[in-house]
């Protein structure tokens, strides 16, 4: 087994669950584990891609199962907006068909997606008045999808974490997981916190 040597004595803490990574996925996992009574600890190092994205979603996918997951995610965003202001708003999503294969996929997705095919002559009227007119030459059509949404990433993550902490979870910011080993049914995790201390 690998032995990790750290300076000084390591404080040892037993937790019900440990989540490494505090983006949208890790924060949501911490929230749901907390609501299940597991008293999880979320270890977050920095601000990753979840803080830089548009915090939105769309139900337009090439398979219906992914669209179904997206619709359920949309319901979660609506619930979050009812709890606190996350700048949630419904939008439309545009996917351009760059070849016949893509066009066939977009048309097929209408069986499980609320949207419409937009022809090049209607791009300005249905997508945006100032749209680049050269797109008419490049793309044979576009799919305009309804039931899409956006929200502010930081507000969404902060609210999700707040709900998790309120339910019994905790967050360790500016911390790093430096080692993980398995011990039977449990895991030993070594974390360096923001004070430079090592905790197991």
Predicted regions and their residues:
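Flavin (FAD/FMN) cofactor-binding and adjacent substrate-gating region
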Residues: 99-173, 179-185, 190-192, 197
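Glycine-rich FAD pyrophosphate-binding loop
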Residues: 34-51
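Glycine-rich Rossmann-fold phosphate-binding loop(s) that bind the pyrophosphate
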Residues: 21-27
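Extreme N-terminal leader/targeting segments of oxidoreductases
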Residues: 1-17, 32-36
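Core beta-strand elements of the Rossmann-like FAD/NAD(P) dinucleotide-binding domain
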Residues: 12-15, 194-200
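Hydrophobic Val/Ile/Leu positions in short beta-strands of Rossmann-like dinucleotide-binding domains
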Residues: 19-20, 42
């Amino acid at each position: 087994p690998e032995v990790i040597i750290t300076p000084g004595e390591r404080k040892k803490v037993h937790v019900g669950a440990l989540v490494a990574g505090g983006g949208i996925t890790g924060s949501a996992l911490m929230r749901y584990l907390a609501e299940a009574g597991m008293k999880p600890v979320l270890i977050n190092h920095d601000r990753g891609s979840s803080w830089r994205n548009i915090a939105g979603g769309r139900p337009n996918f090439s398979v219906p199962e992914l669209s179904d997951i997206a619709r359920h995610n949309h319901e979660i965003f609506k619930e979050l907006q009812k709890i606190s202001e996350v700048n949630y708003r419904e939008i439309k999503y545009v996917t351009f068909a760059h070849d016949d294969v893509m066009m066939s996929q977009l048309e097929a997705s209408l069986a499980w997606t609320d949207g419409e095919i937009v022809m090049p002559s209607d791009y300005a009227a249905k997508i945006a008045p100032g749209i680049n007119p050269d797109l008419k030459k490049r793309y044979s059509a576009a799919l305009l999808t309804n039931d899409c949404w956006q929200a502010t990433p930081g507000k969404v993550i902060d609210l999700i974490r707040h709900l998790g902490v309120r339910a019994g979870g905790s967050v360790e910011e500016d911390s790093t997981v430096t080692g993980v080993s398995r011990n039977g049914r449990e895991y030993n995790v070594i974390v360096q916190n923001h004070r430079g201390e090592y905790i197991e």
